[in-house]
């Protein structure tokens, strides 16, 4: 029985260090792409079976450019991206003239980041500064549909572009107090957006998992396969101890303004913040009935930080150096980012290149029902619901295309009751 291919390698055009072009698509037996919501670049790996002695005839020296053209046959989407060979790994000499190895690739933006330093002043919103920095230094474009709140005047002191972008992103906040992320996707390229925008997205797809881990051959209809979570595992459920130590549910900040000679102490309140911001689901993860020594968990603020306004220090966490709303950026962004991963699940689904990090999915999990429990509910109402895609591994091999992704949420679909 022949394999029905789910992707097509249209072209893998390699340009050597001296400008010689070679089409090597017939040597590629596997492609792996990695996206992360916390990474400004994607990673790519090409698995090669080389019977043409490419490694010597080109030769491969880690100074080559690759133009990649891949078609996703599950959706019809086409991917065209430029990469550079970063390294040659896992080299195994086979019989005769055959060799196997992996080409690890980096994006064109990654290469520019490695070659340039930013020494420049930027004035305006964080989103405008990142857009300009991406264009001028990474020679690329970034998709953004919103303006960050507040104006900054900053001087980047000989940093690589990615470091400058990371520094700026940490200081970005939306009009409603959501933090920003800067990331790269296989299909859409660079994106700069806030969690306010992410949470407002329509559900990209609904995935259903029924019973135990479903074998990859169980669903024989394409439509069913594209909506099936073939396998899932819970990576983390809250880890309350770690998040309490990080101040995810309560913390305080000492704000010292040298210029005005003032001192202020402000606190973060999880309960108030949860009600103020839109969330993936309706109910908070931390129960208002849970107490420690007769106090709610959210009433403790044992995690303290100090912020010096108008400080001359540049490379510090004193986020208010260049913006008078820095304390709110720090006090609201950090706890929120810790909360975004209170529930983490890794799952395997059918591959599609339009599924990227930053998308919102709906995940329905069938509940485990002991025979002693009589209920008409088929789904786990706590675990089921909306999730944000945080990490993705696109795996194309032997004609098959699967995605292994990490998804996360910070709220529950059902309130915990007695």
Residues covered by each model-derived region:
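Second-shell loop/turn segments in exported
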Residues: 114-123, 150-156
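An acidic/polar, Gly/Ser/Thr-rich interaction patch typically located in mid-to-C-terminal regions
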Residues: 31-59, 213-418
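Assembly/oligomerization scaffold segments
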Residues: 1-115
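Right-handed beta-helix
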Residues: 133, 168, 203-205, 253, ...
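Sec/Tat-exported extracytoplasmic proteins
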Residues: 137, 169-172, 365
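Glycine-rich, acidic and aromatic/proline-enriched surface loops and short helix-turn segments
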Residues: 98, 106-112, 123-143
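Short beta-strand-centered interaction patches in the first periplasmic/extracellular domains
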Residues: 100, 107-109, 144-241, 245-247
């Amino acid at each position: 029985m022949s394999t029905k291919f789910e992707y097509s390698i249209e072209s893998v055009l390699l340009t050597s260090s001296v400008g010689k072009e070679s089409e090597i698509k017939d040597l590629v037996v596997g492609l792996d792409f990695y996206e992360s919501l916390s990474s400004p670049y994607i990673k790519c790996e090409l698995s090669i079976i080389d019977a043409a002695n490419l490694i010597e005839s080109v030769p491969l020296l880690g100074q080559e450019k690759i133009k990649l053209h891949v078609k996703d046959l599950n959706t019809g989407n086409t991917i065209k991206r430029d990469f550079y060979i970063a390294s040659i790994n896992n080299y195994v000499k086979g019989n005769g003239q055959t060799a196997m190895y992996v080409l690890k690739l980096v994006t064109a933006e990654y290469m520019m980041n490695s070659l340039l330093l930013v020494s420049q002043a930027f004035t305006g919103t964080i989103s405008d500064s990142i857009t300009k920095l991406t264009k001028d230094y990474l020679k690329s474009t970034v998709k953004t549909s919103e303006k960050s709140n507040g104006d900054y005047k900053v001087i980047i002191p000989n940093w690589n572009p990615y470091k400058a972008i990371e520094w700026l992103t940490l200081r970005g906040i939306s009009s409603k107090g959501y933090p920003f992320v800067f990331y790269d996707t296989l299909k859409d390229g660079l994106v700069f957006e806030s969690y306010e925008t992410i949470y407002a997205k329509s559900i990209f797809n609904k995935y259903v998992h029924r019973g135990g881990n479903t074998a990859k051959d169980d669903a024989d209809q394409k439509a069913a396969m594209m909506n099936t979570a073939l396998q899932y595992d819970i990576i983390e459920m809250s880890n309350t101890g770690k998040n309490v130590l990080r101040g995810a549910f309560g913390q305080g900040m000492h704000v010292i303004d040298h210029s005005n000679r003032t001192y202020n102490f402000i606190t973060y309140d999880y309960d108030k913040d949860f009600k103020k911001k839109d969330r993936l689901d309706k109910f908070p993860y931390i129960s208002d009935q849970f107490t420690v020594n007769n106090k709610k968990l959210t009433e403790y603020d044992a995690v303290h930080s100090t912020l010096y306004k108008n400080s001359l220090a540049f490379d510090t966490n004193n986020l208010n150096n260049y913006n008078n709303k820095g304390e709110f950026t720090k006090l609201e962004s950090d706890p929120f980012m810790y909360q975004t991963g209170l529930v983490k699940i890794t799952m395997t689904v059918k591959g599609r290149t339009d599924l990227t990090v930053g998308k919102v999915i709906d995940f329905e999990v069938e509940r485990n029902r002991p025979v002693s429990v009589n209920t008409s509910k088929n789904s786990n109402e706590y675990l089921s619901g909306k999730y944000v895609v945080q990490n993705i591994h696109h795996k194309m091999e032997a004609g098959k295309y699967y995605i292994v992704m990490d998804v996360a949420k910070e709220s529950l679909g059902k309130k915990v009751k007695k």
